[in-house]
Amino acid sequence: MNQAKSSQAIAEALRADICLNRGIEDGMLHEVALAQRFGVSRTPIRQALQRLAYERMIAVKSGVGSVITPLEDTKRADDIRAAVAIIEAAAKCAPPHPVPPVHFMSIVGILGMMDICELNRAEDFFDIRARLLAALADMIENPILSDAFRAAYWRLIRWSILDLATAPQHQAAHLRELLQSAARTMKTAT
């Protein structure tokens, strides 16, 4: 049994399970089984599931339960366009002051982690992507945009992990380029 006390820690573990497609054969997240797995009551499980629903990783269906939101090839381009639009909106709403050095150091730290990770391993790739999401979302001061960014970026993470299976070098290079670009942009803005 994996002990996790907070709903945030439970949500993090479930995000990893969803993104890495592990241990969820039927596409459902069952409250009772999750409560047993994490050694908690159903209250923190419900809170974690509520957060995942807010991020559009799952859908809570009356009489059915919590269902993982599927990735549909026909909606992939829409998912990407939505993420781009949210990123552009966040940039337009960014405050005029320079990025605090702590944010720059966070991105540089993630870049350093890439050098010691095996990015062709889905778990390592997921960890780097999840850290990048957290770092970028923390920079977005508008809470509505930050939440929208998180939902859209989790979707992109799921797509990129699918692509990792067939094109690991391309995905790793793209991730490194993204992080380097973010670091350069932040360095010139500080």
Model-derived features: positions:
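An amphipathic alpha-helix signature
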Residues: S7, A11, A130, Q180-A183
